[in-house]
Amino acid sequence: MRHKNGYRKLGRTSSHRAALLKNLTIAIVKNGKIETTLEKAKELRSYVEKLITRARKGDFNAHKFVFAALQDKEATNMLVNEVAPKFATKNGGYTRIIKTRTRRGDAAEMAYIELINE
């Protein structure tokens, strides 16, 4: 059965959603921590953790896979060469979501999503 195997649509078309996740991933790789809405953070966690798991191998194919997803040389090199080796012995759980506040304009729940430093 495939119940509950969906994803959050985030009120966007599929191409807009893909671009959003790509841009948020680049931001979290470069900065280590970003603030976004809670729903975006939860969806981003799944996307980022799959990329980090793939990047842990560090071989040519890992570079190719990550670059295909991010299309940013700087972020790809940071992810494969700096971020992923930190998690070489860890199986999943590379990110942390911390709820912060409700946004004043639309009362959306905000949260920080960050890479865990170990």
Curated annotation (Swiss-Prot):
Domain of life: Bacteria
Molecular function terms, GO-annotated: structural constituent of ribosome
UniProt keyword annotations, A-Z: Ribonucleoprotein, Ribosomal protein
One cellular component (GO) term of this entry: cytosolic large ribosomal subunit
InterPro entries: Ribosomal_bL17, Ribosomal_bL17_CS, Ribosomal_bL17_sf
SUPFAM superfamilies: Prokaryotic ribosomal protein L17
Gene3D superfamilies per record: Ribosomal protein L17
A Pfam family this chain is assigned to: Ribosomal_L17
GO biological process per UniProt: translation
Oligomeric and partner information: Part of the 50S ribosomal subunit. Contacts protein L32.
HAMAP family hit by this protein: Ribosomal_bL17
Family: Belongs to the bacterial ribosomal protein bL17 family.
NCBIfam families documented for this protein: L17 (TIGR00059)
Protein name per UniProt: Large ribosomal subunit protein bL17
